[in-house]
Amino acid sequence: MDFSLKKLAAATLVLASLSSFTTPAFANLTAQQSADILTTFNDASVKDFRQFLGRVAKSDVAKTDALAPSISAFLGNKTLSAEQQNEIHRLLGLYARLKYGAAATETLRELVAIPTVRADGVPQHENPEFLKIADKIKSLAQSFNLDFRNIDNRVYEVSLKGSGKEVVGIHAHADVVPVTPENWVLQDGTRLDPFKVTLIGDRMYGRGTEDDKNGIVVALYAMKVIKEEKLPLARHFKLVIDTTEETAGDAIPYYFERNPVPEYNLALDGSYPVVIAEKGYGTVMATFARRKAEGSGAEITSMTGGLATNQIPSRSVATFVTDTPAELAEALQKAGADYAKRNGGNFQIDAKVRGKDVTLTVTGVSAHSSEPQSGVNPVARMLDFINSLDGNIALKRNHITDAARYAADNWGLDYLGSKLGVGFSDEFMGPLTASLTYVAMDDKAFKLAVNLRVPKGKSPETLKSDIAGKLDAWTRKSHITPVFELSVAEPMYRNPEGEWVKALLSVATENLDMAHQFGTSAGATSVHELPNGVQFGLAKPDVKYTGHTDGEFKTTGQFLMDLQIVTEMMGRIGQLPKL
């Protein structure tokens, strides 16, 4: 849309009337006042934005909050001050929440029902589930009168056009991490289907509700509102939907090799209010060649862990083969209780006889590996416990006991890299974290991953060299020789300036009643390498992040707040005269 200033003035908000300001202009509407508006109106009473504003202007809320002048100026197509403009955008977000909250919730249900998990041996862009979600997003975009492009089934792009040349990229992703269905059980015994949104209380359980199909949905509906209300924009918005964010990470580079990079980039895949720093993502993958068991006693034949390197599961299960299962189960149960008591008592170890085998289960608390402090890692505890049995319960030595010794000697239950001696911290970004996560075994090898989250303060090459040197010393001492693969990415640290970032900070902190300051994250997103890249929600930093966990959920209140915030943000950023 190529609006002239005359047309802009006649349409709705007048871009020409806004002057650049060096301090953020606030919307004179508190979180409590917004809540009062939400309780006064409902979706059935809201037809369009102008009708909504007219009704708000006549309400007691407007009189109390002095909103009438802003609404009157807007409806009369008059020049708005920066503060008035921001009040109108705040009301736009509230309108979107009231008008489309129920529809957006239903769309989230539909997207979660598509299991967009990586399939072994199938490229993501050929996976039928991704073709299905691409068609669904295309259908939604077109029904919202938005432009849709499918870039070779790798990235889905939805565009909202403005009048200028600048482009703001809004980033979300359609892929999700794998699930272990048997772990999706609530404390009261309720079993959940990971790919069906289940509403219990205010929690919407389902894989992708938090990470990151919610981001796709709220961005689409925010675009819809701005489009159908014909609000003029000084720049374009592109919703860039990644398909490999949780795995190879090759879809976004593929996209930008063929398409221009937006000047500004916001990831709806992290934390509020505005995150300007992301730790670097790293992996220490140890591969233990399968070997014939040696010695006497029981043999551990299998062990489970996370299904992805960035996932701390709620349970780890090991299978023991023995001639005396009842006696072994009893001994493991007693040893497990003692071990749990010595190590915090915040996890459980259970041994049960299954035919001729014994199944050992360590139950902890699932977490995203970027926040190991929010969980209790059962993988680390399983391996450390197995290693602690040496000399107490007879076990044959094989590749799994080798891995247990490696884990116990080098990583232990500590997730700060202290045991290996590689820990360090940055005052703003926080400490390095190192979490035992992924476990896999085939007929050739047993694999065990440690997921690293690395702050600024030490170069990736230096850190890799430190880790490699210490692990090499351990292999010489232990005579256990796994193959190690190390990777460490640079952390992201930005010092953004300009009206755009002031606006982002104001929108998030005012709506969420948060401190007006930038944040940092241990999670890496699609904007890690992109210009002017920041995270803009959609999780609150003081609330446990449930993405990647068993029993992932998003609260209905926060989901609707996200819709409100993202709509307000797009209206406000879209109409700033200068970013």
Could you tell me what each predicted segment is?
Residues 1-27:
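Gram-negative bacterial Sec-dependent N-terminal signal peptides
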Residues 28-205, 233:
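Acidic/His- and Gly-rich active-site-bordering loop/insert found
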Residues 170, 198-247, 284-292, 316-327, ...:
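Alpha-helical metal-binding/catalytic segments enriched in His/Glu/Asp
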Residues 212-291, 333, 414-427:
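Acidic/histidine-rich catalytic neighborhood of metal-dependent amide-processing enzymes
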Residues 276-304, 309-362, 369-433, 437, ...:
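Acidic-enriched catalytic cores of C-N bond-cleaving enzymes acting on peptides and small amides
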Residues 441-464:
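C-terminal catalytic subdomain
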